[in-house]
């Protein structure tokens, strides 16, 4: 298994639609303003989150149960920034849509810019032949409110190509998050 370079990522995005929309370079400024970078890097791709969020709240005193997760645990929010309450979390989705090849596994890691502020992005794989918008989780580990930015870099995806094709892909087994189009809550 090997990590894939910028050349391979660019080719797969431009010729096979692996990442849409795709930025072929690191973007660090928009309209003269500094932003948290996104786009193609040497051995990965920095993704953005869209401006739709679900912010966790316990105002309804529900129990957090991954087998029976209540939508009432979240407040929906749309905007260019999202404030996460202290010691809480928010869900968002990527701006980019992914189509992962059958012989590739990706790993999504948080950006150090956010980690240095106590905001942690979940580590998650995108399995072979998975496609959709990625649901991201941002944990605010601080005792203070924390801000995340839509349309700016939030995490990096690394692409690992196997030396052989898997017998059963995510699509073959009918994975429960296949083709997700928005922020998707846990499914058992």
From Swiss-Prot:
Pathway: Pyrimidine metabolism; dUMP biosynthesis; dUMP from dCTP (dUTP route): step 1/2
Keyword entries, A-Z: Hydrolase, Nucleotide metabolism, Nucleotide-binding
Reaction equations catalysed: dCTP + H2O + H(+) = dUTP + NH4(+)
Pfam families to which the protein is assigned, alphabetical: DCD
First-level EC class: hydrolase
Superkingdom of origin: Bacteria
Catalytic site: 137 (proton donor/acceptor)
Transmembrane segments: none
Keyword ATP-binding in annotation: no
Cited InterPro entries: dCTP_deaminase (IPR011962), dUTPase-like_sf (IPR036157), dUTPase_trimeric (IPR033704)
GO molecular function: dCTP deaminase activity; nucleotide binding
Residues reported to bind dCTP: 111-116, 135-137, 156, 170, 180
GO biological process assignments: dUMP biosynthetic process; dUTP biosynthetic process; nucleobase-containing small molecule interconversion
SUPFAM superfamilies in alphabetical order: dUTPase-like (SSF51283)
Protein EC: 3.5.4.13
Role of this protein: Catalyzes the deamination of dCTP to dUTP.
Family to which the UniProt record says this protein belongs: Belongs to the dCTP deaminase family.
Quaternary context: Homotrimer.
Entry protein name: dCTP deaminase
Organism: Acidithiobacillus ferrooxidans (strain ATCC 23270 / DSM 14882 / CIP 104768 / NCIMB 8455)
């Amino acid at each position: 298994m090997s990590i894939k370079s910028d050349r391979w990522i660019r080719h797969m995005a431009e010729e096979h639609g692996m990442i849409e929309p795709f930025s072929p370079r690191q973007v660090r400024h928009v309209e003269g303003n500094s932003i948290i970078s996104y786009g193609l890097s040497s051995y990965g791709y920095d993704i953005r989150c869209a401006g739709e969020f679900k912010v966790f709240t316990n105002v309804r005193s529900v129990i957090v149960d991954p087998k029976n997760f209540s939508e009432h645990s979240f407040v929906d929010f749309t905007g260019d920034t999202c404030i996460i309450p202290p010691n809480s979390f928010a869900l968002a989705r990527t701006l980019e849509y992914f189509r992962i090849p059958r012989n590739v596994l990706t790993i999504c890691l948080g950006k150090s810019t956010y980690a240095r502020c106590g905001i942690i992005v979940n580590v998650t794989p995108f399995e072979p032949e998975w496609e959709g918008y990625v649901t991201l989780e941002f944990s605010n580990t601080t005792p203070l409110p924390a801000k995340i930015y839509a349309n700016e870099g939030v995490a990096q995806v690394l692409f690992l190509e196997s030396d052989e094709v898997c017998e059963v892909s995510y699509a073959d087994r009918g994975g429960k998050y296949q083709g997700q189009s928005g922020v998707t809550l846990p499914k058992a």
